[in-house]
Amino acid sequence: MNLLHDIEPGTADEMNVIIEIPKGSKNKYEIDKETGLIALDRVMHTSQDYPFDYGFVPQTLWDDSDALDVLVLTTYPLAPGILVRCRPVAILGMIDGGEKDDKVIAVPTGDPRFDTVKDLSDVNPHTLKEIEHFFGTYKKIQNKEVETTGFQDAKAAKEAFVRGVEMYKEAK
């Protein structure tokens, strides 16, 4: 099974997300587009860990030529390859290496701890600072610049999902 191409993306209200990197990891796993397997891309050589689970929406494409990225706010780390149904609540604008590389912020629909988190305004402000700090600094040790351009609401995140699905279909 190819995790990128064989799994439906879900809907804008409940996306399917494949976890690549567990919360707390320094290992940077990525989906191998040809095999559909999750492969070790590199080990981060910084003191930072991923603040939450990180993955992608299958059958999507984004401006960086990869699937649409998603940071899933979880209480406990999930293993790479796990399928999680998520509600998009925000999106972080990002420019990485001159390319748009936005990150959807989502919550698992199966975790009652996040039942009240429906939009950007429902996310703890410190959590947002933590996310923005991580993505703004995690490549500095490699002398690479990443620019974060701020958060947008759930509506913008859902629009990104729809656009990502459309871009994938157009590229097929």
Which role fits each region the language model picked out?
Residues 1-172:
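Hydrophobic N-terminal alpha-helices or hydrophobic patches in metabolic proteins across all domains
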